[in-house]
Each structure stands twice: as C-alpha cells, then as structure tokens.
Amino acid sequence: MLFVGEDPESTVVWGALDHDLNLDIPGFPRSDKVADIKWNRNKNKIARIKKDMPLHNEMDKYDMFTNGTLKIKTLMRNDSGLYEVEIYDSNGVNLLSKKFDLKIQGKSLTPKFLHLKTGAI
C-alpha cells in the first residue's frame, strides 16, 4: 500500500525521537572510483564529501563518514522526510542513488505499568 506523498523507490527507515540515527548505504561501491557523495533532504543539499576536498555540511545536525553513511544527531519530529544519497565517480558518472523515507517514532509520554495480582497467572 502506498500513501500520498510517498516515493515508491524509497526505503522506509524508522528513527527514535531524541536519538541519533545512521543512514547506511546498502550496496555502497567500496572502490577508489568514488569521488563525490551528496546527501539531500527533501531536495535540499545537507552534506557532501568530494575527493580531495573537506567535508561540507549545511548544518551541525549532520555528520557524514567516508563510507557515505549520514549521521543525523538528536532526531526531532521535523527531521522526518525524504533523504537521498547520490554517489559519483571522478567523471561525474552516477555509481549509485538511494532514497530513504525517514519516519520518527515518538516516546510515550506516560509510563505503562502492568500490575498482576498474586495467583492471577
């Protein structure tokens, strides 16, 4: 079943409110061919690693590792959305593109306790 606004080519990823999340890239090409890794959120650039250039982050909210993994720090509800990674070689040829639809799970505001009477089981 597809919901309005969902991308059929994206992988749904769940993150926990107030926790960090790593978006790992399945099928990441582990070779010297990788020259440029770009991450976008809802079509806006958020992080980029280009060979022989320092890491570029749009915000302190994100870290990116050399294997392309994007770390999102301290998830908030407004961090949900479509994240896309694009990996290119030195000739600008696209080696891999992946999309992730991030959903945020909130914490329960009230603790739940179960009280069993003696002999109830």
Outline where the language-model segments fall:
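N-terminal V-set
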Residues: 1-3, 19-58, 96
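N-terminal Sec-dependent signal peptide, specifically the hydrophobic helical h-region
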Residues: 1-13
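Proline-centered linker/hinge motifs at extracellular inter-domain junctions
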Residues: 3, 106-112
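Intrinsic-disorder/low-complexity, polar/charged segments enriched in Ser/Thr/Lys/Arg/Asp/Glu/Gln
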Residues: 10-12, 20-22, 69, 97-99
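Solvent-exposed, conformationally flexible loop/turn segments
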Residues: 15-20, 118-119
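Extracellular beta-strand/loop-rich beta-sandwich domains predominantly from IgSF
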Residues: 57-80, 89-91
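Extracellular/luminal immunoglobulin-like beta-sandwich modules
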Residues: 82-108
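Extracellular regions of mammalian proteins, primarily the fibronectin type-III
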Residues: 112-121
